[in-house]
């Protein structure tokens, strides 16, 4: 099998990446098969069935074409792609396969963001949508996300069905396709019209509302991705021009040369933005990840000091400020079960109903669809990993609408001689100070997968837990879909889908553990209202030392 793949190396689109791999890395591409999981596909480049290349992309596309023809008589798909290596090439390969096998494809000629894709699926009434992106992963990654007709990512059941169709493609090296030029001439692959982009921009403008003043100054960065120029265009339309762009960090560039990883969850991502803010005396720095579904912010003060806000803190700001703006009598917040503990306390304090879902924004999208006819107003949907949604004209994380609204709130606070930090401190004074931390432990190769399983098996067996002076209350085991009262041993069913997640709830907050759905990583979530927060984190890490599990 390996020889057949090597014979087609020059056609694979990934020859230059293959040539940089070690022998072990090359072998790993043949030890596994890329699977379409509940989070889509995400991997590194290389040859073999376990890596991203022209042939594994075409295999996905043929399976997807057969899946679409099963659910629709006249399937139509819109594809968007980000600024990563091979994103455009992969989108064209998918378009060729889909078009050859009976699916109409809408294909833009330049990069677009994830929220634009989610919006376009609904706006154009397509059967499905595809986003080529690996979000904020390192530059040698790419991936595929699939969206249903509602604009949300595919849920578990349709994902499994699609996966079956993909698995039925047994000869990915010899899939016959028509050329793109012919498919375009026959109007099977059709161009993406600017009207959809204008409709999305109008939806964001309607959400945010025009600026009446512009005294606060903002630095914008796309981290070499897709949020610019659309975000700057929207701000101009909203009568806000008091911003500067960190141009060296906002040129589309697959290498992401100005950052280690293009991830606004990491504070050092803002180093260049801070320098520009100093030169420009700006008050706010906003950075979005490459596909513009996540964002981060840093606030700068008159004395030149700055404050970085983590994902939970941004959520608290949005929850409080949007609640005050809406003044709705019946409202709700949708969040993941690993989102910070204080968000639920704040929602309760503000009389906002809370809907908890599993990790993954597709579960938030599912709730949005279920609530379409509900009279309650959505205040905020968010995850701690810097993903937010204020209005469901998009059905995935939307850093563009969120950025515009945060800039508007910053301007309003400036008029009141207030800052985001002031708003957060008021919340802490009222409800207590919680600290949040998310750790990503990376495990490499097949051995790493075994280590992750070993750790999760350990947690799966626990009926109680001791960490410092924390008082354990409940263990929520989403693997078993059981919630256990630590004191009484009483068990109850968790009314959410099964997931590889265990959450330890204490009187002081929670600690949760789960493997990543897209990468060989273990994620640990800490959200606690304690003085010795770092001590608790260190003790927990010592206790799960993989050599002693």
Regions of interest found by a model, annotated:
Residues 78-141, 234, 241-297:
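N-terminal small/polar loop signature for handling phosphorylated ligands or for N-terminal nucleophile
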Residues 88-93, 118-121, 140-146, 229-234, ...:
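Short acidic, glycine/serine/threonine-rich loops at helix termini
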Residues 30-50, 135, 222-230, 234, ...:
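Conserved phosphate/anionic-ligand binding catalytic regions in large, soluble enzymes, centered on
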Residues 25-34, 142-271:
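Gly/Ser/Thr-enriched, mixed-charge loops and adjacent short helices
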Residues 278, 282-284, 305, 325, ...:
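Phosphate-binding and adjacent anionic-ligand microenvironments
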Residues 2-94, 101, 182-183, 187-218, ...:
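An N-terminal, well-structured beta->alpha segment
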């Amino acid at each position: 099998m390996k020889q057949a793949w090597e014979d087609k190396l020059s056609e694979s689109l990934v020859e230059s990446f293959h040539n940089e791999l070690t022998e072990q890395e090359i072998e790993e591409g043949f030890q596994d098969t890329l699977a379409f999981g509940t989070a889509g596909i995400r991997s590194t480049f290389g040859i073999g069935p376990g890596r991203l290349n022209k042939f594994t992309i075409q295999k996905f596309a043929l399976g997807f074409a057969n899946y679409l023809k099963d659910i629709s008589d006249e399937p139509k798909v819109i594809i968007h792609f980000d600024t990563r290596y091979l994103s455009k090439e992969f989108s064209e390969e998918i378009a060729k396969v889909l078009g050859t096998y009976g699916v109409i494809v809408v294909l833009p000629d330049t990069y677009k963001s994830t929220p634009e894709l989610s919006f376009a699926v609904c706006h154009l009434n397509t059967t499905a949508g595809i986003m080529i992106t690996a979000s904020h992963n390192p530059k040698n990654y790419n991936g595929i996300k699939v969206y249903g007709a509602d604009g949300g990512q595919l849920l578990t059941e349709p994902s499994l069905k699609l996966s079956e169709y993909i698995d039925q493609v047994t000869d990915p090296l010899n899939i016959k396709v028509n050329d793109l030029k012919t498919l375009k001439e026959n109007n099977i692959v059709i161009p993406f019209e600017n009207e959809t982009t204008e409709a999305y921009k109008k939806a964001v403008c309607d959400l945010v509302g025009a600026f009446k003043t512009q005294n606060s100054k903002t630095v914008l960065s796309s981290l070499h991705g897709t949020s610019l120029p659309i975000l700057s265009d929207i701000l101009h339309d909203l009568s806000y021009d008091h911003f500067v762009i960190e141009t060296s960090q906002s040129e589309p560039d697959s290498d992401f040369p100005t950052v280690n990883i293009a991830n606004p969850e990491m504070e050092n991502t803002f180093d260049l933005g801070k320098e520009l803010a100093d030169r420009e005396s700006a008050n706010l720095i906003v950075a979005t990840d490459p596909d513009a579904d996540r964002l981060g912010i840093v606030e700068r003060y008159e004395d030149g000091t700055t404050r970085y806000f983590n994902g939970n803190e941004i959520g608290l700001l949005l929850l409080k400020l949007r609640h005050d703006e809406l003044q709705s009598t019946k409202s709700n917040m949708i969040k993941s079960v690993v989102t910070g503990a204080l968000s639920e306390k704040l929602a309760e304090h503000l009389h906002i109903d809370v809907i908890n879902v599993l990790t993954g924004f597709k579960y938030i999208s599912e709730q949005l669809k279920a609530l379409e006819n509900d009279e309650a107003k959505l205040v905020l949907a968010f995850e701690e990993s810097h993903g937010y949604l204020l209005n469901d004209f998009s059905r995935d994380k939307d850093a563009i609408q969120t950025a515009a609204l945060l800039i508007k709130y910053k301007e309003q606070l400036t008029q009141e001689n207030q800052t985001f930090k002031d708003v957060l401190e008021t919340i802490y004074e009222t409800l207590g100070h919680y600290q949040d931390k998310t750790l990503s432990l990376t495990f490499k190769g097949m051995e790493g997968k075994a280590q992750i399983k070993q750790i999760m098996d350990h947690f799966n067996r626990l009926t109680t837990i001791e960490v410092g002076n924390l008082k354990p209350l409940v263990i929520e085991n989403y693997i078993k879909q059981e919630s256990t009262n630590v004191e009484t041993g009483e068990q109850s069913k968790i009314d959410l889908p099964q997931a590889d997640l265990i959450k330890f709830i204490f009187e002081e907050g929670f600690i949760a553990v789960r493997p990543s759905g897209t990468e060989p990583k273990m994620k640990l979530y800490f959200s606690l209202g304690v003085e010795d927060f770092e001590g608790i984190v260190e003790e927990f890490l010592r206790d799960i030392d993989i050599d002693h599990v």
